[in-house]
Structures are given as structure tokens and as C-alpha cells.
Amino acid sequence: MWCMRRLPTNSVMTVARKRKQTTIEDFFGTKKSTNEAPNKKGKSGATFMTITNGAAIKTETKAVAKEANTDKYPANSNAKDVYSKNLSSNLRTLLSLELETIDDSWFPHLMDEFKKPYFVKLKQFVTKEQADHTVFPPAKDIYSWTRLTPFNKVKVVIIGQDPYHNFNQAHGLAFSVKPPTPAPPSLKNIYKELKQEYPDFVEDNKVGDLTHWASQGVLLLNTSLTVRAHNANSHSKHGWETFTKRVVQLLIQDREADGKSLVFLLWGNNAIKLVESLLGSTSVGSGSKYPNIMVMKSVHPSPLSASRGFFGTNHFKMINDWLYNTRGEKMIDWSVVPGTSLREVQEANARLESESKDP
């Protein structure tokens, strides 16, 4: 069972706008906060490392016009409280789920999206769907990814499509299912690949909960965050894709600014196109020194495509080798069965901790 925590809210706030957009205050007539900080233009053009079926290539990001607000909230202030006070009662009610369940580390980065017309329409649609139909995941779990993987802890991003649409499956994490639901077909193939890469990985298809990954900094993000029961893709093209693309963009902008590691593990064309629309298409380059963003691509682990390039990629191990050997950071323990672990990962992480304690 998850526990919602309130984290400090002095996170860096990043906002990207090419032009002034109409916000919901224009609809409801609410006053804009006088505390709004001016935007500061950010830079793009960083390089990153791309792995496609095991081949490393250096890639230049395309220059993307964007603005980054690097001002922080004043110490001891609460972003949600400040934000909520400047909303109309109607909008406050509509955004109650965002205010109550999005982790404090994410909220300052995302809050500008909530006032945009597309998001208001999206919330109106989802609210009506929840009133008229069964919608997955349960409301409290729609943003569980923010609580399980705080913004500044994200190291790896895995992008899915829409949530599982049967009972006791979706809980806000892509590819993951609630216990005791067994692993779906795509996740079974993920386990098969992990077993090839790490022989001591315990492959148990009765287990489908990937919360252990999320708690280590693996963001499991679906591009659509809700779905009507037994109706796949029923909530796609209603605004979630715009929102989750912004989530990815904010992570890229933040990591470009602070140099922290970020890995994209992209399975299938939808995930690849989303990230390439922000980072640019890959192009062959040269050089032995790679900066802080790595992109790894393959076909989707679905039974329909896994045999055409998912198996044998060695991506999970390559991610760990890059984090540990190149970035000097802890590896991800990809184990899923409670009480099990990957020996190689545990030993490497123990060495790293020991080295950090040495004078």
C-alpha cells in the first residue's frame, strides 16, 4: 500500500512556452497570482548517447526554442497552497485530484499545465467518464508514478501507452500490475530478456508489480494515464498525450541544466517518436565521451514484435554499466520477486557506497 508523502517544494520550476497561451482564468475570470516569476530562456543543443539494438551512436539534439523558469519557491512555502489560493472554486474542484495526489516534487514543474485549456477539457472528459463508467486506474493511483518516483530521483524513463483495462491491473505504472495479478504477456517477455542478461534474475510470472523499479528512479510512464474499463485506448487523443509529453520535456530540460543522468528506454515506435520529437532524430556521430542523457531503442516487448528485435538487446545491463562505469552512480536492481536481488548489482552498489565513505 502506498503512502502519500509531502516533500519539500523548493524544487526548480521549469516552464516551456513559445508564446503566451490562454489559460483557464480567461474562462473563469480568476485573478492571476502577482507572485508569478518571469521566464528565463534556456539553451538546447546538448549531445546524448543513443543505443539502437546494441550499437552506440552520438547524437546532437535539435535546437528547440524553450523557456526555463529557474526561480524557486520561497523557503518554507507550499506550492500547492499558493497555487490553490489563486484558483476559482470551480477550477479548484476540477483539479482536486492533482492538488491532493501529485507528489510535491513534481507539482511545481507541472502546475502551469493544469490551467491550460487542453488540460481543463481533459479533466472534464475524465470526470464525466468516471461518473458514467468504470475507469482505470482508480483515481488515487492515476498519479502514483509521481509519488513512487520523485522528480529529482528519476534516472530511467520507460514509456508505455495506455493503462491495462481490466480489474485489479492498472495502478499508475506502465507495464506494471497490482498484486496478485500475474504478469501480462509483454511483461513476461521483459522477464525473459532480464533472465538472459542476469542469470540470477528470478523469473516468476505470478509477479507483475514493478514498484521496486519505480522506487529506484525508474519512471514507468504511460502516454495516456486513464482508460475506460475493457476498452483499450478509449482515453487516447483527449489530452493525456500532450500532458505526458510535457512531463518528458520537463525532465529533459532539467537534466540538461543540472547534468544529472537520464536514460530513455524506448520500446516501440510510439515511445521512440515521442522522445525524438523532443531530442531530435538520431544521427551517426563519433567520439568517446558521452554526456548525461542516454537513449536506448528497440521494438515493443509485445508477443507480436518481441522476436523482431527486443530479445538480445542487453539494454538492462547496458544501462547499469553506463550508470556505474561512466556516471559513477548506483545500478538499478531489476529484480521483481520480493526477497530477491541481482548479485552483480548489489555488489557494485556496495562498492560504490564503500568508496563514497572513504576519506
UniProtKB/Swiss-Prot annotation:
Transmembrane segments: none annotated. InterPro entries: UDG_fam1 (IPR002043), Ura-DNA_Glyclase_AS (IPR018085), Uracil-DNA_glycosylase-like (IPR005122), Uracil-DNA_glycosylase-like_sf (IPR036895). Residues 1-21 form a transit peptide. Optimum pH is 7.5-8. The keyword GTP-binding does not apply. GO terms for biological process: base-excision repair, AP site formation via deaminated base removal; DNA repair. It is found in: Mitochondrion; Nucleus. Belongs to the uracil-DNA glycosylase (UDG) superfamily. UNG family. Present with 4820 molecules/cell in log phase SD medium. This is Uracil-DNA glycosylase. The gene is UNG1.
